[in-house]
Amino acid sequence: MQISSSEICELISKKIAKFDIISSMHNEGRVISVSDGIIQIYGLSDVMQGEMLSLPGDKYAIALNLEKNVVGAIVMGEYTHITEGTKIISTGRIFEIPVGSKFLGRVINALGVPIDGKGRIQEEKFLPVEINAPGVIDRQKISEPLQTGYKSIDAMVPIGKGQRELIIGDRQTGKTSLAIDTIINQRNTKIKCIYVAIGQKFSTIVNLVRQLEDNQALNHTIVIVASASESAALQYLVPYSGCSLGEFFRDQGKDALIVYDDLSKHAIAYRQISLLLRRPPGREAFPGDIFYLHARLLERACRVNSNYLKNILGTVNKFSTGSLTALPIIETQDGDVSSFIPTNVISITDGQIFLESNLFNSGIRPAINPGISVSRVGGAAQCQIIRKLSSGIRTSLAQYQELIAFSQFSSELDEITRNQLIHGKKLIEILKQKQYHPMSIAEQAIILFAAENNFLNDVSVEQIIKFEKMLLLFFNTNNSELVLSINNYKRINDVVENQLSDVINAFKLTKCWS
């Protein structure tokens, strides 16, 4: 059977008419080398810094090095399936993480994937892990306190909502415990917490999550993990992912707290990546942009004003604000705060809480050195009652330290000096606090009031801790309305002072602490 040329033309015309061309242009390249989670890609001609690159098997990489003919990228997760010649496709998007309120109470990895075995999390939206910090015009003055529950911090080194306060000290000095207690203290507030674990053992993280559960603090907390067994790429990414989760709450007009534990390991992970990418090393083999690494992360923690929220949410109350408070942790070696990473982060943050091994080993917990611990926000981040009652504590402790040094060279001391030494010892005992026992504003105010108004003069140093315990029990049992009033109004006046004095005098008649 023969087909004429006209029939052939007609068949071809029908086929062409039915043919649906779906064209999609994308930029692709090929892997030319793979080593230690770093891939070198040839052929990607149009790529952004930090862009997400698509790999086979639903995996992704982030472009970090942009050279003339080659792009250097870090693989997020396993890279054993990637070989020379593997096709890489650019996505045109910065790396994003799922965010939402349903992440509260869950443990996730750096990519936002749950690792606690409780099932999938329904995200509300996706946010870039790298985003510019709010500008100066968008920021609100820090004026509201974020209570840690520690007398020594809330009295001497107050932290405000939107502040960046560094926790620094040697290993095993209670840095993580302090941060976890701060999270626990937010259980009765509306503050959402994010704990970022960088380069830690899984056993440590499991114990930490269990402590949060036991203290009813996991429901308002997100734990985001890049453990020591995971790649340097994930350890580098995880604080930025955690920050995006915190910004989600901040930009809804809520208050959030984020703990980075710790940025020393984060810097080491970034150094490893930079050396593998053959970037020129600088001081301590860290790359030249190590300061910018932490600056762009910590600058995202702030308190934003109502105009900023209005641009995001539409209509808001003119007094509405949102905040993200950061508590970065840095581990020092043998108390050396002058090394590269500690000095960098000290210069970025709004103050530091310095924990000393000597104080920790001598039984002073938290082991805060009041001499070099400072909050650059100061009294603006304290409620009125704590600000008034704590005004003389730092001075008294400084005088005590001077007198201790002086008394070592003098065998005879006058009565005034002896009384100052005893008062200083009592203050140190008062500022001691057990782990997982944060205090309310009223409880702190009661103890500080007793110390500042000479109610401890007839209490020996050895009896201080028991005196404090029994005094708080007496208040909570017999004067719960006064305690509730102080917690609600957070102010002190002549009436409150008289009420406190009367109750403490009534308590002292019982002599139940001796």
UniProtKB/Swiss-Prot annotation:
Principal cellular location given in the protein's record: membrane
Keyword set includes Cell membrane: yes
One family name in Pfam for this protein: ATP-synt_ab_N
Subcellular location(s) per record: Cell membrane
Record-marked site positions (Required for activity): 373
Gene3D superfamilies: 2.40.30.20, ATP synthase alpha/beta chain, C-terminal domain, P-loop containing nucleotide triphosphate hydrolases
PANTHER family per UniProt: ATP SYNTHASE SUBUNIT ALPHA, MITOCHONDRIAL (PTHR48082:SF2)
Name of this chain's protein: ATP synthase subunit alpha
